[in-house]
Amino acid sequence: MKTVEIVERIEGEAKLSCTWKNNIVSDARIDFLNFRGFEYILEGKAPLDALVYTPRICGICGQAHLKATVDALENIYENINEPLQVTNKAKLLREIGLNIEIIDSHIKWFYMFILPDIIKLDTPDLGIYSPLKGTRWLEACKTASETIKALAIIGGQWPHTSYMMPGGVVCDPTLLELSSMQNYMDSAIRFFEKSIVGVDFDKYLSFDSENDLHFLRGDLAYFRDLSFKYSLEKYGKSYNRFITLGTSSLFESGKIRQRLAHKLDLTKVKESSEHTFLLEDDIKNSKRHTWSKSVSYDN
């Protein structure tokens, strides 16, 4: 068994233990040993307090936690036959905030975490991608901050915004504010075209097969070339099973298994505490090894 005591690239520390057989991972176990306890923090609190607490689960993806919280609170009203009517404008502002944060996260993920590690496979000199001093690294940080400025216009602050509320949002951006948001996001699009993909935005959106990856000219092309040079496409392959819950209006919910698409049934999502530490559990149980719960779909 091989163990990585601290798994990086995630929010919060984790421990990874792998069992190998014939140079292939035959079993893996991930332990989250830092107690967060948000479920216990929320006990006894007013329901709306969750809008303040849960975005603080993560300093990167707080919008996702906020959106999930507001959906849960609105679901309560729906279950007592008092559904809240959310306007299309409010829905759109929620989606805009969520997707701006996704764009910000992708820029940071690519330039701060992934690309430097891939380059180190080829050379110790990171050059323009060097953290804190490389010109491209600094450009990426500036671009990410511009997207967050756009989000702050409707969110009031970042991170840990709480502008989504049951029934809608607490912002009503003016035309000037919307123009400012567009300017911030236009700068991100220009960086995307010039530095990330090296092609026109519309041309990139026209890509519909892996063969089109050869048209890339930017940093993504550099990443592509290094990945194939070191056969990274052969690593980490799983079981070709993917799930999207459809929490964004941009994507329909569904399950893909062996290239067949199936309708997603949320009643088949199950949460298990069999291997989870419990505060009220005084009996030492060898099965319990993590503070996280296990989630499965259709067994």
Task: Please report, for each region that a protein language model flagged, where it lies by residue.
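Active-site bordering "gate/hinge" segments
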Residues: 1-299
